[in-house]
Amino acid sequence: MSYSPVNLFDLTGKSALITGSTKGIGKAIAEQFAAHGARVTISSRKPGPCEEVAGAINAKHGDGTAIACPANISSKEDLQRLVNETNAAFGKIDIVVCNAASNPYSGPMAGIQDEQFLKILSNNIISNNWLIQMVAPQMQERKDGSVIIVSSIGGLRASICSVSRASPSPKRPESQRGASSAS
């Protein structure tokens, strides 16, 4: 396929799993992916909002464009179910968008409680690692796929969440480490 402005964003035949996709940035990503031809998995903790967003996308782009799959990102079992249901519905996962996150604390590092810090690590780092580990093998086998990790403007002002968003990843080139904290 040749690339032109017309087909540069054509996602026909692609499937995307998007965490935190019932509102805000995640919902906008899901809507735009569907508008460009992708099939999308809508996911957040609560079933109602997942069904609502998937229903709206299906109403606009046709039945089967979106599925709803509630999942708690802090649960490895929920994430595996999310991957399994997406694979069952669409046959493969081409794009993973790690958008869901939490920030139970905003303030100086000296004031954060252990439970809050552990929740940030679990939801903002460990869950992304699990999800990528679950999906990467099929992408590597096909030699095709994309992983997108959404960050926040929280990196513009130092907080404990900035630490989790800027932490190095062995799979990222040195030049990209920490770049996500400013997005």
Report residues per predicted region:
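The beta1-alpha1 cofactor-binding region of Rossmann-like NAD(H)/NADP(H)-dependent oxidoreductases
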Residues: P47-G48, P70-L82, D114
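Substrate-binding pocket helix/loop in short-chain dehydrogenase/reductase
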Residues: G107-M109, Q113-L121
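Conserved glycine-rich cofactor-binding loop
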Residues: S15, T22-K23
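Conserved glycine-rich Rossmann-like NAD(P)H-binding loop of the short-chain dehydrogenase/reductase
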Residues: H36-V53
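Flexible N-terminal pre-Rossmann segment of NAD(P)-dependent oxidoreductases
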Residues: M1-L17
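Residue(s) in the substrate-gating loop at a strand-loop-helix junction
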Residues: S152
